[in-house]
Amino acid sequence: MKLKQVLASALLLATLLTLPARAAQASGAKGEANITPDTPMAKIRSNPSVMGAGLYTYNQEQDNPRDIRKWKDTTLREYVNDCTAEDCAKGLNRMIENYNSGIQITYKLYTDEEIAAVPTRQKAEIYYFPGSDPGGKFVLVIGGNAIHTSAEMREGVSTAEWLNELGYTCFVLRYRIGDQAADNAPLEDVSRAVRYITEHAEQFHVQPEDYAVLAYSSGGQIAGLFASDSDTLGHKAYGVSKPGALLLGYPVN
């Protein structure tokens, strides 16, 4: 019974967090691409295009509802860190411009039936950052996590911006962490992301083969396992192709 209550609460929280995005999408409202490192998080999250794009701008349990002032008043620089704030702001503005031009940003990785079977799959999604080289290779970016704190913006968006400037198309992965990472859930999410992107390569204007994975910290550990030739944990276990390039930033080992 307790497990069911926990899962029900998780589903309710996920639903509440997506309500603003659905409202923005329904209204067709568009926000300005005017984010700077010193923009408060509350202003970023209330930007109609950020909401409509569907990017996850929280850090899991770091945004406890009992500490509302923290995530409202904190600037982007304070929220991510000084090293990545500039690129993160540029990446958010690029995302806003893409969304305003009609590009879909967020893609769910599992079907409604699959999510109903395993509710935590609701959180798994990718964020699309198209590059300037149509038909080029793509990069899957996997941020780290501190068990209960994710890094979609700090490491994901900032890295996507850097790679976009080089012409590469990027996908930032949001995967299951913490107590939702049981039964190799993160590996399942990585493999599903690769499968989804390669199956929709024409739609995304990317090559389906020889893709790259760039991952940080514990995300690097996950990526390393996925890229291995392990029959139980590697890409072969999930029936997807091996990355053509693997770049790991301070991976956990």
Where are these regions (language model features)?
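Short amphipathic alpha-helix adjacent to the substrate-entry channel of hydrolases
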Residues: 153-171
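Sec-dependent signal peptide cleavage junction
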Residues: 19-26
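Short beta-to-alpha linker loops that shape the active-site pocket of alpha/beta-hydrolase fold enzymes
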Residues: 145, 169, 174-178, 252
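Primarily recognizes the serine-hydrolase "nucleophile elbow" in alpha/beta-hydrolase
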Residues: 192-253
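Bacterial N-terminal signal peptides
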Residues: 9-18
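Catalytic nucleophile-loop/oxyanion-hole region of alpha/beta-hydrolase
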Residues: 151-155, 173-208
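N-terminal cap/lid segment of alpha/beta-hydrolase-fold proteins
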Residues: 59-61, 65-134, 183
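Short beta-strand element of the alpha/beta-hydrolase
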Residues: 136-145
